[in-house]
Design a protein with these regions (language model features):
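Positively charged n-region of N-terminal signal peptides that target proteins for export
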Residues: 1-9
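Sec-dependent N-terminal signal peptides
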Residues: 8-20
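C-terminal motif of bacterial Sec signal peptides marking the signal peptidase cleavage site
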Residues: 24-26
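Beta-rich carbohydrate-recognition and catalytic domains
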Residues: 30-178, 185-328, 333-428, 440-445, ...
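Conserved positions at the start
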Residues: 64-66, 178-180, 326-328, 433-435, ...
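Non-cytosolic beta-sandwich-type ligand-binding/adhesion modules
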Residues: 149, 223-229, 458-468, 476, ...
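Acidic, glycine-anchored loop motifs typical of Ca2+
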Residues: 255, 263, 280, 588-600
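Aromatic, loop-rich ligand-recognition surfaces of beta-strand-rich domains
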Residues: 599-663, 690-742
């Protein structure tokens, strides 16, 4: 199903020409309509249009894979503007603010151009650029197509290198296979960074990357690029360019360097050093230029050099850099300001499988190679043991229970001072763990990743949980996974993996790629490609585990509320007091912000619990009036509990709507017989397409109460077959888009 958008407001109030005002009566246990019938849009149309002022849809219109994304607020952009300008003025004392703003734009321009927007980059590159770009930026390649959006649905190409983010110059070490980029903003410098992987050029004895030998993915290294703003163009990092953004300057515009050859930062601390030739070094004492991969484990980790030497790939030849390709770099700044990078060691001609590793950073471009840690492997969690802790184990026990590193005679079971024990997972994962994203929540760290490989329908987002940034992480089982992925009946979205997290305001989103064809995306052996989708996610306390787990509201192919930052409103149902006619113990699930998708989430639904099946009543009340414009009443995850319509939604109004132009008015309005979209159910095979329900949007009204009455199901067949079971109506969640009235 492909749906187009309505590009203008619905102006529903104007449709109110003549109405019958129904009196309010409270003498019945069953709610009745009162006041005027509220003109509304119900989420369905014959021409495929929908209300884009309230909802978004994962239309899969934007081609892309392995997305990385960021949301930029006014505060972010203002900080970046101020710091970029301050650095430029400090480096060039003769430069005036007026001149800098003439060339780069003033604060209002930056806010208009960059703020309140989402930015996304995807796996891609162009081998050539236009003459215009080549002339302006001295560019030879563009890497990672860059998009901009205000609603996570309409993505416009925005990269300044013919639509791409990174300006690859002739002196670059990279030459193609630009995979899996991610954004991060440095709060210290205000700059924007891209972390990703790329294939190197054909190296030689003098380069930090080896000659092209064997399969192309032997030559994958970590890439870091930097820009003053989110659109770019981004340039490959060098020590000189990065440290220039955080250094202090004297009155002559020179970096402040003390007598010990230490570079001083803006806060007076030492940020790095220079060598006797005046070269700026990174915090490891290494020179990083456009021609040196900034994250090069095969060069700077001695144990990797011993275990995976270039001679294993090309017998009889040697090179200073070992064969240890890496992809899917995920940079994360934790709550305490420490930065870590997570990635997958990629399969090579001398190593099998994709395995997850992590490393702490000394600053934005300097890995602390001594902290390199093995975190996860396909089909296994990992536990770390010191040599002393395994001293009592036999050699055969170690070989059986612990991971081996290296090849042939070079095999070892100790890496970086630890032995890594295999803990089999409940769920199979194929030979791949990739697309790693780590997010901190309280005192827990959630390592999320995708198994199997991108061509599998079950490619999804799964989670593992740890107590420290570098683990160990315990992979959770089928009772808590996937976070975002197919269930047993899903026929509408598949392959929903290699994700990223986006924090926008108070909301968390998961952006992922998905199959064009959720059932068979490789007809006749030809892979159809992937496109971009996005859904909400949040944390939910799990009593069995004793801590919060990550849960995704999706994947969806149904209308969903716009992000708060796009609508200017939020889910005010979360602030409502709720009274129900059914099971009060399950009423808490009506406004927890989570609708149910996976089979294990079925208990997280409100249950009517009326044995006589006379319907259920739900009442939301607010102590302070709220101004609302739309709602979704989410259906049950399970067909046999699902409703096919909402019989009544009645609002108690806080004031007469400004658009209401009739004299008769009695403080109420209502919507009757609000049907669920039939595209969200498969009645022949008895399953739901999750994320659907009954929805409506309308011109703004201010309310203090919302009463919902449901008394109609898709089927009563289950009750008829087995009268001993209670198949009462269930409701998964209620989302009411609105804001408090000041």
């Amino acid at each position: 199903m492909f749906m187009k958008k309505i590009v203008k407001a619905l102006a529903l109030g104007a449709m109110l020409i003549a109405v019958v005002i129904l009196p309010f009566t409270a003498c019945s246990n069953t709610p009745v309509a009162a006041g005027f019938a509220l003109p509304h849009y119900n989420g369905m149309s014959d021409d495929g249009l929908y209300d884009a002022g309230n909802f978004y849809l994962n239309e899969l219109r934007t081609v892309g894979a392995d997305p990385g994304a960021i949301y930029c607020s006014v505060e972010d952009i203002t900080d970046s503007f101020n710091k970029s300008k301050a650095t430029a003025l400090a480096m060039n004392p003769s430069l005036t603010e007026e001149k800098w703003e003439e060339e780069n734009g003033d604060l209002n321009y930056w806010i208009d151009e960059y703020a309140n927007a989402f930015y996304m980059i995807v796996t891609s590159f162009t081998g050539s650029v236009s003459n215009e770009v080549k002339s302006e930026y001295e560019s030879v390649q563009g890497a990672y197509k860059l998009y901009k959006s205000y609603d996570l649905t309409d993505w416009d190409i925005a990269g300044r290198i013919d639509g791409y983010a990174i300006n690859v110059r002739s002196d670059a070490w990279s030459n193609g296979t630009y995979w899996a980029p991610e954004f991060i903003r440095d709060p210290v410098s205000g700059r924007y960074f891209i972390f990703a992987s790329a294939q190197s050029k054909n190296g030689n004895a003098s380069t930090e990357y080896f000659p092209g030998t064997g399969t192309y993915y032997n030559m994958l290294y970590g890439i870091i690029a930097m820009s003053d703003n989110p659109i770019g163009p981004y340039e490959l990092v060098s020590n000189e360019e990065y440290y220039a953004t955080i250094a202090a300057y004297d009155e002559n515009g020179e970096m402040v360097v003390n007598e010990n050859n230490e570079v001083i930062g803006l806060d007076g601390s030492v940020i790095t050093t220079v060598d006797d030739n005046g070269n700026i070094l990174n915090k490891n004492g290494n020179i990083v230029t456009h021609n040196t991969p900034p994250m090069n484990f095969g060069l700077y980790v001695d144990q990797i050099k011993e275990l995976y030497p270039f001679s294993d790939l090309s017998p009889g030849q040697t090179h200073q850099t070992a064969v240890w390709p890496c992809i899917d770099f995920n940079p994360v700044i934790m709550d305490n300001g420490d930065m870590y990078v997570y990635f997958s060691q990629h399969v090579s001609d001398i190593n099998a499988g994709n395995h997850i590793w992590g490393i702490k950073m000394k600053d934005m471009i300097t890995p602390d190679y001594s902290t390199l840690t093995f975190l996860a492997s396909p089909n296994y969690s990992i536990e770390k043991y010191t040599p002393e802790e395994v001293a009592s184990l036999s050699e055969s026990q170690i070989k059986q229970d612990f991971f081996a590193f290296g090849n042939g005679e070079k095999t070892t079971y100790e890496f970086g001072g630890y032995y890594y024990k295999k803990i089999p997972t409940e769920m199979s994962e194929g030979s791949i763990n990739e697309g790693t994203e780590v997010i901190q929540h309280g005192d827990k760290y959630y390592l999320t990743y995708s198994p199997y490989g991108y061509g599998n329908r079950a490619y999804a987002v799964r989670q593992a949980v740890g107590d420290s940034p570098l683990g160990p992480f315990t992979k959770l089982g089928a009772k808590y996974n996937p976070v975002m992925g197919i269930n047993a009946t899903n026929d509408y979205m598949a392959g929903t993996g290699h994700h990223c997290f986006i924090k926008a305001g108070d909301e968390l989103f998961i952006l992922y790629h998905a199959f064009y064809n959720p059932i068979e995306n490789s007809p006749n052996g030809t892979f159809l490609g992937r496109a971009i989708g996005a859904d909400r996610a949040q944390f939910m306390y799990n009593e069995e585990l004793g801590y919060d787990i990550l849960y995704g509201n999706g994947p969806t192919y149904s209308l969903q509320p716009l992000p708060d930052v796009a609508s200017g409103m939020t889910n005010v149902a979360k602030k409502a007091k709720i009274k129900v006619s059914g099971d009060e113990n399950t009423a808490k699930y009506l406004n927890d912000g989570l609708f149910t998708v996976q089979d294990f989430t079925l208990p997280w639904e409100y249950v009517d619990a009326n044995e006589d099946q006379k319907g259920t009543t739900i009442t939301l009340t607010w102590d302070t009036p709220v101004e609302i414009k739309s709602f979704i009443i989410y259906n049950s995850q399970n067909y046999f509990y699902a409703f096919d319509k909402v019989d009544l939604v009645r609002f108690k109004l806080a004031e007469k709507p400004a658009w209401y132009n009739l004299k008769d008015y009695n403080d109420y309005c209502y919507i009757e017989n609000l049907e669920c979209n039939p595209e969200n159910v498969e009645e022949n095979d008895f399953f739901m397409r999750q994320g659907g329900g009954a929805l409506a949007s309308f011109d703004n009204i201010k309310v203090t109460e919302m009463t919902i009455y449901i008394n109609s199901k898709y089927t009563t067949e289950a009750e008829e077959l087995d009268g001993s079971l209670n198949y009462a109506i269930r409701v998964s969640d209620i989302f009411v888009m609105g804001k408090e009235v000041k």
